[in-house]
Amino acid sequence: MLVLKNKFYLIICLLFQTMIFSQNVTMVDPSNNIGIDKWGIVNDGVMGGISQSNIYLNEANNIIFAGNVSLENNGGFASIRRGFDGNQLKEASKFLLRVKGDGNIYKFRLTMRGSYANYSANFKTIKDQWVDIEIPVENFQPYYFGRSIRAPKLKVQKVNSMGILISDKQEGNFLLEIEHIKAF
């Protein structure tokens, strides 16, 4: 009976450990119907720029973020974003993006409830190659209208939106294919 009790406790402990330490929240995965329906486009047109972008699903059911960044009229950015309930993230310590890019540098951005800042982490793509981008939470830096600011550290449980941005004077056509975005 003692052996049976110990096995029971061991199983409960292992299950509990798995629940705590292997948190895996899929934030974006078109193959599981977590796709583009809640995404919106925000380009530099909000400031007089003329950059253009689009978001759609390709034949592989991956998200495509594509367009053209123009520096005319003091423009220079294109972005997609969507609302997200950070309560699902709880204690996530990193994000994993699986993307195929064009060699450009993109920003993965998060915003928190009650904060005017956005928290960004840059990632570089390799032209026409799939890459897994791992971004620890501590790598996110606070920005306000593209300028680095002093602000509280990112708290993932308060995240209320996420997005992808191309900026930093990377003029021309761009294309980013997103297979998934996950939090661990």
What is the meaning of each model-derived region?
Residues 2, 21-184:
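Beta-rich carbohydrate-recognition modules and glycan-binding surfaces
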